[in-house]
UniProtKB/Swiss-Prot annotation:
Gene3D superfamilies: 3.40.630.30. It is an enzyme of class 2 (transferase). Its EC number is 2.3.1.178. Pathway: Amine and polyamine biosynthesis; ectoine biosynthesis; L-ectoine from L-aspartate 4-semialdehyde: step 2/3. It comes from Streptomyces coelicolor (strain ATCC BAA-471 / A3(2) / M145). InterPro entries: Acyl_CoA_acyltransferase, Ectoine_EctA, GNAT_dom. Keywords: Acyltransferase, Transferase. GO terms for biological process: ectoine biosynthetic process. It comes from the Bacteria. One of its GO terms (molecular function) is diaminobutyrate acetyltransferase activity. This is L-2,4-diaminobutyric acid acetyltransferase.
Length: 170
């Protein structure tokens, strides 16, 4: 971690973190907000493929959630990345992506990282493009879910970013 991150700690989420993750996602005003229940389940069932960053008091101020795809055990899909507004600009999102990719590669042998990003989310586009560059990995993009498949009203398409093969962190 950098000097700007020195007072922070990254570890696996716990069920007790679910409400804070839900609030951080809600306050991001960019992410699709899932139910509070889903964040609680995520912290219980997918803690091994997710991470939380805590302030000096142990309070979550950022998170990354992901899972290993059941039909592609070499692939980590990153579901959401968010950092509390007061902690943005410190490189925490990149630290979370790098740290999670390294941990899951070490523990589960993943070589590919995937995520989906809507066309208007330029911050996430930059985050994952720079991740691919740091890893010297190929980045492929294709529309995974077009607007027409979303049943709940207008939704931008979700573009799949597929990054790999991954090399060790930089």
């Amino acid at each position: 971690m950098t000097a700007a991150q020195a007072d922070l700690q990254i570890d696996r989420p716990r069920v007790a973190d679910g409400a804070a993750l839900w609030r951080i996602a809600r306050d991001s005003e960019v992410l699709d907000l899932n139910s509070s229940y889903s964040y609680l389940l995520w912290c219980r069932d997918f803690a091994a493929t997710s991470a939380v960053v805590r302030d000096g008091h142990g309070v979550p101020v950022g998170f990354i959630t992901g899972y290993v795809r059941p039909d592609s055990p070499d692939t980590l899909l990153v579901w959401q990345v968010a950092v509390d507004g007061t902690y943005r600009g410190r490189g925490l999102a990149a630290t979370l992506v790098d740290g999670l990719a390294d941990r899951v590669a070490r523990e589960r042998g993943i070589t590919i990282l995937e995520t989906t990003i809507s066309p208007d989310n330029t911050a996430s586009q930059r985050l994952f493009t720079s991740f691919a560059e740091r890893r010297g990995a190929r980045l492929e993009r294709e529309v995974l879910f077009d607007t027409a498949v979303f049943p709940d009203g207008p939704h931008e398409p979700e573009v799949l970013y597929r990054i790999g093969p991954l090399s060790a962190g930089g």
